[in-house]
Amino acid sequence: MLTFQQLILKLQSYWDAQGCALLQPIDLEVGAGTSHVHTFLRAIGPEPWRAAYVQPSRRPKDGRYGENPNRLQHYYQYQVVLKPAPENILDLYLGSLQALGLDLKQNDVRFVEDDWENPTLGAWGLGWEVWLNGMEVTQFTYFQQVGGLDCKPITGEITYGIERLAMYLQQVENVYDLVWTEWEEPGPNGPVKRRLTYGDVYHQNEVEQSTYNFEHADTAVLFRRFAEHEAEAKRLMGVREEGAADDGAAVPQLALPAYEQVLKAGHTFNLLDARGAISVTERAAYIGRIRNLSRLVAQAYYDSRERLGFPMCGTAAAPAATEAA
């Protein structure tokens, strides 16, 4: 049986062999691996990029107090980014399933058309859900736009739902029953097998974080935080707020620090949404505000790489960024 952590190690080994940089998760609260700086920003511009990493993902509204067998407010994705998307990307993905021990002839693997969109990031792509014997385990996307900029070349993204994949491989119906790891310890009558489950690691976290997300997150503090993160992102993009005093301190466009503020604003918005503190009309407006910040950051990042001559291309010549109408 493949344990939860062995599954991750096998994916790491497989994608390492395909030339991917094995990176670490971004150390901020994000709702998906796509929000990682090494997907969102690296998809912009002409420079090639191959990376893979585990990303803890938080979606406050999806919490169920640890009572739902397959729905979590905190879970893991395994993210693979290939730019430009290779022609054999589907074969590479199927090869990764075989590396996990899946016999493709004995299992029903289906690609179901499901185009992807992330409104807050100004991003969308053509793609598919991958269903393994009737369960969605992966999202497959060809990025068309990121931060409102056309992707040239197209980036291929593969996002594995690690818990769901592990549940199938271990043949369990409750995520908390997943075996995270197992080992043997010496005992008085011989070796004793021990195991650590997903529930041992995360069940209490699901209960308490759900309680916070739905009942105790301070909305007044969250509204203030959102405004602060938004203002800081704008300041780092050189956008002066109306009525703000001119202190004479010019800030260069700092795309990477500004993007961190965008991510913080996004998570704050998700908490407000979970608390029911934002109306349907306000929700659309907040999403628009975050999207506008994402577009500013995307253009600033592109411009900064262009000034450097797109060093990972090996040439200074590259097409101009094209913003969608």
Swiss-Prot record:
Keyword Transmembrane: no
GO terms assigned for molecular function: ATP binding; glycine-tRNA ligase activity
Compartment(s): Cytoplasm
Catalytic EC class: ligase
Record keyword Protein biosynthesis present: yes
GO cellular component term, pick one: cytosol
EC annotation from Swiss-Prot or TrEMBL: 6.1.1.14
Catalytic activity: tRNA(Gly) + glycine + ATP = glycyl-tRNA(Gly) + AMP + diphosphate
InterPro entries: aa-tRNA-synth_II/BPL/LPL, Gly-tRNA-synth_heterodimer, Gly-tRNA_ligase_asu
GO biological process: glycyl-tRNA aminoacylation
Pfam families: tRNA-synt_2e (PF02091)
Keywords per UniProt: Aminoacyl-tRNA synthetase, ATP-binding, Cytoplasm, Ligase, Nucleotide-binding, Protein biosynthesis
UniProt subunit comment: Tetramer of two alpha and two beta subunits.
Family label: Belongs to the class-II aminoacyl-tRNA synthetase family.
Protein name: Glycine--tRNA ligase alpha subunit
